[in-house]
Amino acid sequence: RNRKIESGRRYKLFFSNETFEKFSGSGTPDSEFEALKVLSREFTSGKRKLPVVYEDKDVIFINKPTGMLSQKAKPEDISANEYILAYLIAKGELTESSFRTFRPSICNRLDRNTSGLLAAGKTLKGLQEMAKALKERSVQKYYRCIVKGTVKEASYLKGYLQKDESSNQVLIRRTKPSEGEWLPIETEYKPIRCMGGYTEFEVHLMTGRSHQIRAHLASIGHPIIGDYKYGDSGVNVYFKRNARITSQLLHASRFVFEDGREITAPCGAEFERAWNVIENL
């Protein structure tokens, strides 16, 4: 039964052992940390390198490659989060005892096939401050993408987005429909490079909705190369055949903080392959 909590009164809470362990972190299975230790040996041996673009005592930023999950979708997955944990174990910054009380974690998410900047909190302070900055939008996020079409001027888009959970796709409308739950979106872009009927944009993600950039640009006739949900099938087939592009050319390239600091991550080789093809059209 719902009951209002009153200030100054004492309350007793009763949990099962399992629930208490989950809340306290003391119930972390040894096997989970051991699995991360095994993964960490790939870093200590030099077999694997984490693409770190910035790191201090509280936070770490990596350049996530295309195809890597940001977080686990299934228990057996190895995501960017696990690689960061293993990296910190290899450095001696994360021990089994500290793992039981606090787990470093990513602060933002990217789709599996979107590359670029992922931020993670190494400490509780780092995690809280980064999460707050992202939530309050005091850090500005910029992306790079290559789209179909010739665009020579910057533009600002407003609209409304609705997600269809069954298809994992979103719909975009310029004006808010009278029925259904539609979220306001804002997207700003400017052309960086234009050639052969294709344009590379820097996109300022002003509202961070699911699939926002991909669907918003497609809605104005400029779908991203390699986007199999919202893109041009003929364009996608051409670039898959000629440039080995198998997913959307969308990359989280730059974070800009209120104090003027910037953290950047270079685009992957797939961008260069796409431009090599475009230059020879």
Give the positions of each predicted feature.
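Short Pro/Gly-enriched beta-strand edge/turn motifs at strand-loop
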Residues: F33, L171, L183-P184, S233-F239
